[in-house]
Amino acid sequence: HEPCGESCVFIPCITTVVGCSCKNKVCYN
């Protein structure tokens, strides 16, 4: 999995719309 360049510590991943998900406070695809 590659990082999406987004964190999800305080807010959910915006990048979920492009297939990313939150893992260990970082958004991965």
Swiss-Prot record:
Belongs to the cyclotide family. Bracelet subfamily. InterPro entries: Cyclotide (IPR005535), Cyclotide_bracelet_CS (IPR012323), Cyclotide_sf (IPR036146). There is a cross-link at residues 1-29 (Cyclopeptide (His-Asn)). SUPFAM superfamilies: Cyclotides. Keywords: Disulfide bond, Knottin, Plant defense. The presence of a 'disulfide through disulfide knot' structurally defines this protein as a knottin. Contains 3 disulfide bonds. It comes from Clitoria ternatea. One of its GO terms (biological process) is defense response. The keyword Disulfide bond applies. Disulfide bonds join 4-20, 8-22, 13-27. Pfam families: Cyclotide. This is Cyclotide cter-K. The keyword Transcription regulation does not apply. Probably participates in a plant defense mechanism.
